[in-house]
Amino acid sequence: MIRSFRDKALRRFFQTADASKLSVPNAARIAVILRALAAATRPEHMNLPGLRFHALSGKDKGRFAVDASGNYRITFGWIENDATDVDLEDYH
């Protein structure tokens, strides 16, 4: 389950399928990633082909990321069985 979002446009897209405020063009891929994240019970469940799941380091240690589109990643934390602070960001 997804407990919280950092990105308002991403939350709106997840709740209503309104992609008008997303900063990336591939809304269909974002939707697939968010559905997988909502169904996951461990961060490692996001280690799916093509997503390049990885743990972050440095100031973002304890967070994880998957490829979304181009330089954009969906990043998230994890508490118990839930994703938290889900964000869409270009951190490169």
Spans of model-derived segments:
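Short histidine-centered beta-strand/loop micro-motifs
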Residues: 22-23, 55-57, 64-68, 77
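Short, solvent-exposed, low-complexity loop/linker segments
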Residues: 23-49
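Arg/Lys-rich, positively charged N-terminal/basic patches that mediate binding to nucleic acids
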Residues: 1-33
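Enriched for short, Lys/Arg-rich terminal
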Residues: 65-92
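A short, surface-exposed loop/turn module that caps and links secondary-structure elements
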Residues: 41-64
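N-terminal, well-ordered alpha-helical segments
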Residues: 32-35, 54, 74
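Glycine-rich, flexible loop/turn motifs
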Residues: 1, 9, 18, 42, ...
